[in-house]
Swiss-Prot record:
The lineage of its organism: Bacteria, Pseudomonadati, Pseudomonadota, Alphaproteobacteria, Hyphomicrobiales. Signal peptide: none annotated. GO terms for biological process: cytoplasmic translational termination. Belongs to the RRF family. Its main location: cytoplasm. This is Ribosome-recycling factor. It comes from Brucella canis (strain ATCC 23365 / NCTC 10854 / RM-666).
Length: 186
């Protein structure tokens, strides 16, 4: 095979799309408490914006409770405000430098909304994988046109790129199915 085409680069980019999907899905609420639920929240602190995990420690003491231990007493109010304003429907209870966040039960309608959002994230991931595939196919066509690789090599590599894309999309579908099961679990 030709050294002019690097399928490992495409593989790395597709893995990046899968990791982005996992990260996005990690921010969706399920029936259980998870520290990743608070990861997208940013805090106005010390004149800049920073992720919550840079000003506090997040733990899960119970299945329906999150605990946020703020390191700097002056930041407790800002952290509490950011959690309330996050759009996650959470109401922290301040206890000194610790915020306890009880997670209410998700109702059926909210669960279905979260599943829809998960499917939107999955579609974004599939689109990203297809963009990587298109880039790879365009590269192959150019290499074939410039006579760097033969038509046979191009066809074999195209099949590899397509298989990589199919495998990546199947992995994404599996990840979303697991997340959907977690969300719908009562």
């Amino acid at each position: 095979m030709s050294d002019a085409f690097d399928i490992n680069d495409l593989k790395r980019r597709m893995e990046g799309a899968v990791n982005a999907l996992k990260h996005d899905l990690g921010g969706l609420r399920t029936g259980r408490a998870s520290a990743s639920l608070l990861e997208p929240i940013t805090i106005e602190a010390y004149g800049s914006t920073m992720p919550i995990n840079q000003v506090a420690n997040i733990s899960v003491p119970e299945s329906r409770m999150l605990s946020v231990s703020v390191w700097d007493k002056s930041m407790v109010g800002a952290v509490e405000r950011a959690i309330r304003d996050s759009g996650l429907g959470l109401n922290p209870i301040t206890d000194g430098m610790t915020l306890r966040i009880p997670l209410p039960e998700l109702n059926e309608q909210r669960r279905k909304e979260l599943v829809k959002i998960a499917h939107q994230y999955a579609e974004q991931g599939r689109i990203a994988a297809r963009h990587v595939r298109r880039d790879g196919m365009d590269q192959l066509k150019k290499l074939e046109k410039d006579s760097v690789i033969s038509q046979d090599e191009s066809r074999v590599l195209s099949e590899k790129v397509q298989k990589l894309t199919d495998d990546t999309i199947a992995e994404m579908d599996k990840i979303v199915a697991v997340k959907e099961g977690e969300i719908m679990q009562v």
